[in-house]
Amino acid sequence: TGNLFAIGLLFSTAMAFTGCSTVDDGSYTAPITLSEKISGKWVVNSVMQTDEANARTKTLTDLLDFDTFVINLNQDEAGNPSTFTVEGSAPLLLPTSGTWKMDYNFTKSDNTPSRLLLNDGKAETALTVTAVPGNTKTLEYRLTRKTNGQPFVSYTYNLTQAVK
């Protein structure tokens, strides 16, 4: 029993010293926000119009100069959303300049889509984000027009980040 007690004492002493770890896990890094992923200069890949009443779609990319569409989503020095500008000669479905922000800066736990909010000082335009840049530098959002609360037409913009 004396040997068993000595082994137990040795084992518990060894565990006490090895239980304290001095491994440095690094410093805290803030999570990547949707604003960080979405900010930048985006050029159009395609624009689709959807008739919400009967789900018919039409490609508008090569019509009405949509292929000239560019949106710049700028950040301030702290990395927060700041201003935006829209360039090109496509029809003005969006405001041409103002401020932007996300309705929620992270992926939502209830799987509802995030909204990109454009404010030109007069009104706020909400764009439903349908694809977020990741491995591919593709951003997609949908602008939905409504009358009496009912959607009647939507425009889906598929964009690629411009080369700097």
State the predicted function of each range.
Residues 1-7:
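Bacterial N-terminal signal peptides that target proteins for export
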Residues 15-19:
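C-terminal motif of bacterial Sec signal peptides marking the signal peptidase cleavage site
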